[in-house]
């Protein structure tokens, strides 16, 4: 089952509206009858239901699906449905919700419907096996309705008038002989009685199709009969009616086929075709040979009485009615009819539908009884046409098609949808009759009279048939005078006044002036006046028009085809872009092929080149900025790396010039002492100048932030420059200084506690043991091992009471709880980790934090809050540390530097300095120590502490800085701090680079 075109267009459009409250849970998922949307979502229909394609969303119907129809969706309605679906979707409703079903059903109720023939009606097996399957298609209700109708109206047949009157239907030529081979047998006996009676009914209210399509005839009351009728029964007319009724059915015992004479719409609510232009009311047969005798009159009254008694039975079957009709026919037909008496004229579509639904033998012509009273049959003929005219004009309920007259605007919808393949083989070879032009195909006249169309093809032919508009009197007369045919039925094209053409443009919305200009150009192109087009309207980007009646016999299809063929000329004349043109019969679009739009590739080429140019410009600018920045850093690195080689007078002169400029603007009362010798004592560093508060020790040390906050004087920078010059003049100075540092021996250096047997498993390296006088003491009562030992040393800076750092080894699996206990008891908030977890398969540090969630280490619960990777060199983790004994919680931040390996140095000083700035920015304003650890807590940890301590002294405004003396101060508190000469040289380079950045940031 393919999706309809309007729905495909609806899904391609883009989607905004306030979100409403979601539907209650009770409103979801309930199986309701007739649910919509089964084409788009499975499971909507119940087990006894099937999904019927209604042309929009699909509707669930009980099996068998009888009420089949399609909606006619105009472009405006399609846009409205799209907006409704957007609202429901954004609000959270689905097809399962009752609210969705009610909203969509309400919207669809406003759309016009086109009723379809039942899908099984076109099955050849059904038509060929009518006798075996008819019990499946007719319910007992139709038989009861027939019996009640006979019981109500047969007594009133005695009111038929006997007096012949003048021809009451002058519009139709009654003397015209019926077309040979046509079947005029009515659908049932009631239709024949209605056609041959002079009953008149008040105008029936036009009821909505198809609810009252099969309105019971019993609604008419006896007092509705016209008082004009006489009180006596016209026996000849009743005889003719009953005779024709019985004659139309093939004889045979136990023949159930007369059931097909009951209205076929009882099978399924199919759309009935309104009486076509060529339809004529059936005529009784012509002159009969024998007249009725008085015995026949008596017999007739007796049979009518028996028939009325039979009608009293509520469950009277149609087979019994046929038996009664056989009895009447047997009494009438005293002599067989000789010669071929052909059936008289038939309706255009209703009779052909009988041929399609009836078995094959029902397509043959049947003879009607002949009576020898020509006057009686003449009167029957006159009354028949008069009654037919009255029923047509007043919409009698006897005609199921009457309610359809007010919906004549749907006449073209099914016709436009019918593909050429669905047409019967007769129409493919015989051609099509045009009602207005009265032209007939030559091939049709040459067809053999006995050719029998295939019943299933005939049903397919009329499956998409829609009710026609009744023409004026002249057209009705012409339609009644159709040419003879051999039992075939011509397809009638819809009238041109009912077709709408459209031209779709690229302007949305299209102004009415532009639309009128476009139609004027089309009229000029066709060499017709502007009045040639009627009812010109602009709908969105399209112009909709109708083609008036014209002597050129030009149709809407001709106009739309001309618009397609001359598309370029129209676009040039109007300045519009024509996208499509086609025929629009009442909301359904029949598109015509037209040349595809040739996309202007020039604009895409221009846009492509512009995009490429922009991308290249951005890349070029980025590359230039990177090169400039990299070049400046490269030059600085070259200067620093050449300190031990060829001396550079440029660097020295630059630093000295900066110093002179800085000194020139200083107050005159400030005097500096001579810098003639280096200070080697630790006491001179610790006692120099007033000390700021402990909270001021933190420094961001950033090239953009730290110099602005630094208290370092230009003279300090000059001192650092002089220190570097001293190393440059004496190439072996750095190595000798390192040898002196290696020979330095701390006093005291006792490590008895760390060497105890119970503490030996807690040491990662025997070369780095804590001094007894400088170690972190844990509270043994809170320790899981009841010990106060951990391999960690406090590092003092300027305040011997408050350590600035805690240098410790990387935790072992057995010391993780001790590590977190030290973090808690020291009040630490920042951890600096300078080692990866493993190097070349050697474990450097235990994974002492959870990867996700939380872990408990003794009485401390560590919860990982976040983990951010700042760059490829380091990342930052945030923890919640909770003491399960006191239920207190603190926040701890870990800075993990990844690219510094054991006994080595980082690849660049820049990455470590940037890492230090991040650490100090987080630490700013705190007075707690920073825990620094690597693997053994000495080499990499000592280098980092040395760099940070020297730079912090410079930021506080220290007048004298001695890096070697500072390292000795660190080794007094923990052995092995800065383990290699490369690490010491790296510390000097990092300090020099940071000083250089500070000097550049100072105001000139």
From Swiss-Prot:
Query: What catalytic activity is recorded?
Result: O-phospho-L-tyrosyl-[protein] + H2O = L-tyrosyl-[protein] + phosphate
Residue ranges annotated as transmembrane are 604-624
- Taking every annotated instance into account, which residue ranges of this chain make up the domain Tyrosine-protein phosphatase? 734-994
Q: Where is this region: Disordered?
A: 274-294, 333-360, 393-459, 665-710
Keywords of the record, alphabetical order, are: Acetylation, Cytoplasmic vesicle, Glycoprotein, Hydrolase, Lipid metabolism, Membrane, Methylation, Phospholipid metabolism, Phosphoprotein, Protein phosphatase, Receptor, Signal, Synapse, Transmembrane, Transmembrane helix
Q: Which residues carry this modification: Phosphothreonine?
A: 700
Motif Tyrosine-based internalization motif: where in chain? 655-664
Residues annotated as region Involved in localization to secretory granules? 1-409
Recorded topology in the membrane:
Single-pass type I membrane protein
Stored SUPFAM superfamilies: (Phosphotyrosine protein) phosphatases II
Q: Where Omega-N-methylarginine occurs, residue numbers?
A: 259
- Extracellular topology ranges: 28-603
Entry-annotated residues carrying N6-acetyllysine? 959
| Residues annotated as the enzyme's active site | 934 (phosphocysteine intermediate)
InterPro entries recorded: IA-2/IA-2_beta, Prot-tyrosine_phosphatase-like, PTP_cat, Receptor_IA-2_dom, Receptor_IA-2_ectodomain_sf, Tyr_Pase_AS, Tyr_Pase_cat, Tyr_Pase_dom
- Quote the PTM field: Subject to proteolytic cleavage at multiple sites.
Location within or outside the cell? Cytoplasmic vesicle, Secretory vesicle membrane; Cytoplasmic vesicle, Secretory vesicle, Synaptic vesicle membrane
Q: In what ranges is there compositional bias, type Acidic residues?
A: 419-430
Site positions per UniProt: Cleavage: 415-416
- Modified residue annotations for Phosphoserine: 340, 424-425, 681, 687
Gene Ontology BP term (one):
insulin secretion involved in cellular response to glucose stimulus
Q: What does this protein do?
A: Plays a role in vesicle-mediated secretory processes. Required for normal accumulation of secretory vesicles in hippocampus, pituitary and pancreatic islets. Required for the accumulation of normal levels of insulin-containing vesicles and preventing their degradation. Plays a role in insulin secretion in response to glucose stimuli. Required for normal accumulation of the neurotransmitters norepinephrine, dopamine and serotonin in the brain.
UniProt record similarity statement: Belongs to the protein-tyrosine phosphatase family. Receptor class 8 subfamily.
Q: What is this protein called?
A: Receptor-type tyrosine-protein phosphatase N2
Q: Which gene does this sequence derive from?
A: Ptprn2
């Amino acid at each position: 089952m393919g999706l309809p075109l309007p729905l495909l267009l609806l899904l391609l459009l883009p989607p905004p509206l306030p979100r409403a409250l979601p539907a209650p849970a009770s409103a979801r998922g309930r199986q309701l009858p007739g649910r919509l949307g089964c084409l788009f979502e499975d499971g909507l229909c119940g087990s006894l239901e099937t999904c019927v394609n209604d042309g929009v969303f699909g509707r669930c119907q009980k099996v068998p699906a009888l009420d089949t129809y399609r909606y006619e969706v105009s472009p405006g309605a399609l846009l409205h449905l799209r907006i409704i679906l957007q609202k429901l979707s954004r609000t959270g409703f689905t097809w399962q919700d009752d609210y969705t079903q009610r909203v969509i059903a309400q919207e669809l109720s406003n759309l016009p419907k086109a009723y379809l023939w039942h899908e099984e009606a076109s099955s050849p097996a059904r038509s060929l096996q009518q006798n075996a399957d008819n019990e499946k298609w007719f319910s007992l209700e139709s038989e009861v309705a027939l019996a009640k109708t006979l019981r109500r109206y047969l007594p009133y047949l005695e009111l038929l008038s006997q007096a012949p009157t003048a021809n009451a239907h002058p519009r139709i030529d009654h003397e015209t002989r019926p077309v040979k081979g046509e079947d005029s047998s009515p659908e049932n006996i009631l239709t024949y009685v209605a056609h041959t009676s002079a009953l008149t009914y008040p105008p029936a209210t036009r009821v909505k199709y198809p609810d009252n399509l099969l309105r019971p005839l019993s609604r008419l009351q006896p007092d509705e009969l016209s008082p004009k009728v006489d009180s006596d029964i016209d026996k000849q007319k009743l005889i003719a009616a009953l005779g024709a009724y019985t004659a139309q059915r093939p004889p045979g015992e136990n023949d159930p086929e007369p059931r097909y004479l009951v209205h076929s719409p009882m099978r399924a609510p199919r759309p009935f075709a309104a009486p076509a232009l060529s339809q004529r009311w059936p005529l009784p047969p012509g002159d009969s040979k024998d007249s009725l005798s008085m015995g026949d009159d008596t017999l007739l009254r007796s049979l009518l009485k028996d028939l009325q008694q039979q009608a009293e039975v509520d469950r009277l079957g149609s087979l019994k009615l046929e038996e009664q009709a056989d009895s009447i026919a047997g009494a009438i037909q005293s002599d067989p009819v000789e010669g071929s008496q052909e059936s008289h004229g038939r309706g255009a579509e209703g009779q052909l539908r009988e041929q399609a639904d009836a078995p094959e033998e029902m397509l043959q012509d049947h003879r009607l009884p002949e009576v020898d009273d020509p006057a009686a049959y003449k009167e029957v003929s006159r009354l028949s046409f008069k009654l037919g005219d009255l029923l047509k004009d007043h919409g009698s309920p006897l005609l199921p098609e009457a309610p359809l007259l007010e919906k004549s605007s749907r006449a073209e919808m099914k016709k436009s949808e019918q593909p050429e393949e669905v047409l019967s083989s007769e129409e493919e070879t015989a051609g099509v009759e045009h009602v207005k032009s009265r032209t007939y195909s030559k091939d049709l006249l040459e067809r053999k009279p006995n050719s029998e169309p295939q019943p299933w093809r005939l049903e397919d032919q009329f499956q998409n048939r829609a009710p026609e508009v009744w023409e004026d009197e002249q057209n009705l007369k012409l339609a009644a005078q159709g040419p003879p045919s051999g039992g075939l039925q011509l397809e009638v094209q819809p009238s041109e006044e009912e077709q709408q053409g459209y031209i779709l443009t690229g302007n949305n919305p299209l102004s009415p002036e532009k639309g009128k200009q476009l139609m004027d150009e089309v009229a000029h192109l066709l060499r017709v006046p502007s009045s040639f087009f009627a009812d010109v309207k602009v709908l969105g980007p399209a112009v909709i028009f109708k083609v008036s009646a014209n002597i050129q016999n030009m149709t809407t299809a001709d106009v739309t085809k001309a618009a397609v063929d001359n598309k370029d000329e129209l676009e040039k004349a109007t300045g519009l872009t024509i996208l499509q043109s086609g025929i629009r019969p009442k909301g359904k679009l029949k598109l015509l092929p037209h040349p595809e739009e040739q996309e202007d590739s020039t604009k895409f080429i221009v846009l492509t080149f512009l995009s490429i140019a922009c991308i290249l410009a951005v890349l070029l600018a980025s590359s230039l900025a990177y090169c400039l920045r990299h070049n400046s850093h490269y030059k600085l690195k070259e200067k620093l790396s050449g300190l031990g080689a060829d001396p550079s007078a440029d660097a020295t002169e630059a630093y000295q010039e900066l110093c002179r400029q800085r000194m020139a603007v200083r107050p005159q009362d400030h005097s500096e002492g001579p810098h003639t010798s280096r200070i080697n004592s630790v006491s001179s560093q610790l006692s120099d100048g007033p000390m700021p508060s402990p909270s001021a020790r933190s420094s961001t040390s950033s090239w953009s932030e730290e110099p602005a906050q630094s208290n370092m004087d230009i003279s300090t920078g000059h001192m650092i420059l002089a220190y570097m010059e001293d190393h440059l003049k004496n190439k072996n100075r750095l190595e000798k200084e390192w040898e002196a540092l290696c020979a330095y021996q701390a006093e005291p250096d006792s490590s008895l506690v760390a060497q105890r047997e119970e503490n030996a498993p807690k040491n990662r390296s025997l070369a780095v043991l804590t001094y007894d006088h400088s170690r972190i003491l844990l509270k043994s009562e809170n320790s899981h091992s009841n010990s106060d030992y951990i391999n960690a040393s406090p590092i003092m800076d300027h305040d011997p009471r408050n350590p600035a750092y805690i240098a410790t080894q990387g935790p072992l699996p057995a010391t993780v709880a001790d590590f977190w206990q030290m973090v808690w008891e020291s009040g630490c908030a920042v951890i600096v980790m300078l080692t990866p977890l493993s190097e070349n398969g050697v474990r450097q540090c235990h994974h002492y934090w959870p990867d996700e969630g939380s872990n408990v280490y003794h009485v401390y619960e560590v919860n990982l809050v976040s983990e951010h990777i700042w760059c490829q060199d380091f990342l930052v983790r945030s923890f919640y540390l909770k003491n399960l004994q006191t239920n207190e919680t603190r926040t701890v931040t870990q800075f993990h530097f990844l690219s510094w390996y054991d006994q080595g140095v980082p690849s660049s000083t820049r990455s470590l300095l940037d890492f230090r700035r991040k650490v100090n920015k987080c630490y700013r304003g705190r007075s707690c120590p920073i825990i620094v650890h690597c693997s053994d807590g000495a080499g990499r940890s000592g280098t980092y502490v040395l760099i940070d301590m020297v730079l912090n002294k410079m930021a506080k405004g220290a007048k004298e800085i001695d890096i070697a003396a500072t390292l000795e101060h660190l080794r007094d508190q923990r052995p092995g701090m800065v383990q290699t000469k490369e690490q010491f040289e790296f510390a000097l380079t990092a300090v020099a680079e940071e000083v250089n950045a500070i000097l550049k940031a100072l105001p000139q």
